[in-house]
Amino acid sequence: MKLILQEKVANLGNIGDQVVVKPGYARNFLLPLGKAVPATPEHIAEFEKQRAELEKAAAELLAKAKARAKKLEDKSFKITANASDEGRLFGSIGPREIAQAITEAGIEIEKREVDLSQGPIRQVGEYEVPLRLHTDVSVNVKIEVAPENSNS
């Protein structure tokens, strides 16, 4: 299926690129999220009119992501959770808890920007967690997981 990208898509292309993808990828991901439109003659003409506007919006998003990355550089955040005497957590810490801790510290982060590809955190300790703020911008933050003070 031939599409025109409306924004930069990792491992696929930039704004305005005409790409050929499998129909399922187009139907289930690119089209519903507004990342692409079918490459019909009407859409091609319409896109050429809007190209400057879309590129300006993309540049603004990139600048905002870089500014947020600069704020997050060399920062560490502390999260407390119930843990056993051996340091195993009762439960786990996932993207939602990490995003909430960073947001409470004053920097807006969405849970979808937290990249816990290695799985949720289940032990007390310090972890380097990558944040993907934009397709071109990522930053690592330190997350310190500490046990809550409890009488167990």
UniProtKB/Swiss-Prot annotation:
Keyword Cell cycle: no
One GO MF term attached to the UniProt entry: structural constituent of ribosome
GO cellular component, one term: cytosolic large ribosomal subunit
Transmembrane segments: none
UniProt entry keywords in alphabetical sequence: Ribonucleoprotein, Ribosomal protein, RNA-binding, rRNA-binding
Keyword Phosphoprotein: no
Highest taxon, organism lineage: Bacteria
InterPro entries in the cross-refs: Ribosomal_bL9, Ribosomal_bL9/RNase_H1_N, Ribosomal_bL9_bac/chp, Ribosomal_bL9_C, Ribosomal_bL9_C_sf, Ribosomal_bL9_N, Ribosomal_bL9_N_sf
Gene Ontology terms: biological process: translation
Pfam families: Ribosomal_L9_C, Ribosomal_L9_N
Function: Binds to the 23S rRNA.
Similarity field: Belongs to the bacterial ribosomal protein bL9 family.
HAMAP family: Ribosomal_bL9
Name this polypeptide is given: Large ribosomal subunit protein bL9
Organism: Coxiella burnetii (strain RSA 493 / Nine Mile phase I)
